[in-house]
Regions:
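Short, compositionally biased "basic patch" segments
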Residues: 8-66, 113-120
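A short, gly/pro- and small-residue-rich
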Residues: 166-187
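Short glycine-rich or small-residue beta-strand-to-loop segments that form or flank ligand, phosphate
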Residues: 72-79, 101-105
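Gly/Ser/Thr-rich loops at beta-strand to alpha-helix junctions
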Residues: 79-88, 108-112, 164-167
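Histidine-anchored nucleotide/phosphate-binding helix
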Residues: 62, 83-101
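C-terminal functional extensions of proteins
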Residues: 189-265
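Active-site glycine-rich loop that binds ribose-phosphate moieties when present
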Residues: 135-154, 160-167
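Long, charge-dense
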Residues: 93-146
Length: 265
């Protein structure tokens, strides 16, 4: 099947290109069909949030950068969608923070998919990728997401889990990890369970975290710690929901009739 030509002038050019790329990567076996559904859900929330990083998400991304800088064993967990959408951003982040371990973790795990995800990351420039041949299991999880590397997620103190499912986020918290999620849905169980939920689109979030790391990496730990402590999870989630509500209220307000006085605000 050949991909359709998408004119650059199309108002949704970027979104259509991303979809076409994901569809191709599904045909190659990197992304699972369920990943396309997950992407559609993410897009819907991005629409509701205005398709840009909100000030609250930017603050959470700065805090995430601070947590990663302070962590002893920071790990970034990568699934099929993350590798397909953001391999370059993952590579850039691992360059900015060489201590960051990148680990493949799949819900729909097969040895072939684990290898494809690891290959995509290596091709993008990630020097070392764990999780292809997992060596341990996370307690209290029945799914294949429980498979982890003993030198990666199992010993991590801080774990970034983009596009995660709620069960594993919960299991990671139970295992004593500090969990940073990236999920456009503020209502998802993952966002609700993470100690630091980032409600933003994946590539935007990873770029902002990267910039935060570059900006703060020579700071005193106490100053970095102040940034890390500056964000409360419940406030991140309620501010995202308030933003959606205010935006919808504004958009749903009836157009003023010609000749009628304009509404204030
Ligand atoms: O590659 P695998 O086998 O590990 O499977 C990956 C998927 C994504 C299929 C699996 O983790 C899954 O089913 O995820 P969920 O439970 O659908 O959750 C994905 C969440 O990510 C949803 O809440 C979406 O709103 C959100 N999401 C999707 N795309 C983006 C996103 N959030 C931020 N940026 C995106 N680009």
């Amino acid at each position: 099947m050949t991909a359709p030509t998408i004119p650059r002038s199309h108002p949704r050019y970027r979104s259509l290109m991303v979809r076409s790329d994901l569809a191709e990567k599904m045909a190659e076996g990197l992304v699972v069909p369920e990943g396309l559904m997950a992407h559609g859900r993410g897009e819907a929330f991005d629409y509701l949030l205005g398709e840009k990083t909100t000030p609250e998400a930017a603050k959470a991304e700065r805090a995430a950068a601070a947590h990663l800088l302070l962590a002893r064993h920071p790990v970034l967990s990568v699934n099929g969608n993350v590798a397909a959408l953001a391999a370059a951003e993952v590579a850039s982040l691992s360059k900015s923070l060489p201590r960051l371990t990148v680990e493949v973790n799949l819900f729909h795990r097969t040895p072939d998919r684990a290898r494809r995800v690891a290959d995509a990351l290596r091709q993008a420039g990630v020097p070392t990728v764990l999780g292809e041949h997992p060596t341990a299991r996370l307690r209290g999880l029945a799914s294949d997401r429980a498979w982890v590397d003993a030198h990666g997620i199992l010993r991590a103190d801080v774990v970034v889990v983009p596009l995660e499912d709620g069960d594993r986020a919960e299991a990671l918290v139970r295992a004593g990890k500090f969990v940073i999620s990236v999920d456009l849905n503020p209502l998802s169980r993952t966002s609700q369970k993470a100690q630091l939920p980032i409600v933003d689109e994946l590539t935007r979030a990873l770029r902002h975290i990267d910039l935060g790391i570059l900006r703060m990496r020579r700071w005193e730990p106490s100053r970095i710690s102040t940034v890390a402590q500056s964000v409360e999870a419940p406030e991140v989630l309620s501010s995202a929901l308030r933003r959606i509500r205010v935006r919808l209220d504004r958009l749903a307000a009836p157009e003023p009739r010609r000749g009628s006085p304009r509404r204030a605000g």
